Amino acid sequence: MAHNLALGAHGEDLAARYLTEAGMEIVDRNWRSRYGEVDLIAAEGDWLVFVEVKTRRGLGYGSPAEAVTFSKQRRIRLLAVEWLRDSGRHWSRVRFDVVAIMIGHGPQPQIEHVRDAF
């Protein structure tokens, strides 16, 4: 379990750096409520982006992006509503992205950013 938590935290760090280098601003990380946790919340222009990060070392359990099930999507939407209410800020546009990371297949991690994933 600790190994999975460390892998997940490493993946979130990689994703945050990747998104920042792509011009996004990280607004919040690991925001929690009774519904669970949002990995990253970022701003890109007038978009507020809720980002689910999935990190894998292999494809034994499927690709990282495939791990974002309908149930997980629904939970992230609930979290987004709570975050928006609690933040007190208004965003004209909101979207949900997935950053899928494969580690251990070559010298560099493979990062796939799926915009507006759900």
Swiss-Prot record:
<dbReference type="InterPro" id="IPR011856">
    <property type="entry name" value="tRNA_endonuc-like_dom_sf"/>
</dbReference>
<dbReference type="GO" id="GO:0003676">
    <property type="term" value="F:nucleic acid binding"/>
</dbReference>
<protein>
    <recommendedName>
        <fullName>UPF0102 protein RHA1_ro06551</fullName>
    </recommendedName>
</protein>
<dbReference type="InterPro" id="IPR003509">
    <property type="entry name" value="UPF0102_YraN-like"/>
</dbReference>
<dbReference type="InterPro" id="IPR011335">
    <property type="entry name" value="Restrct_endonuc-II-like"/>
</dbReference>
<comment type="similarity">
    <text>Belongs to the UPF0102 family.</text>
</comment>
<dbReference type="Pfam" id="PF02021">
    <property type="entry name" value="UPF0102"/>
</dbReference>
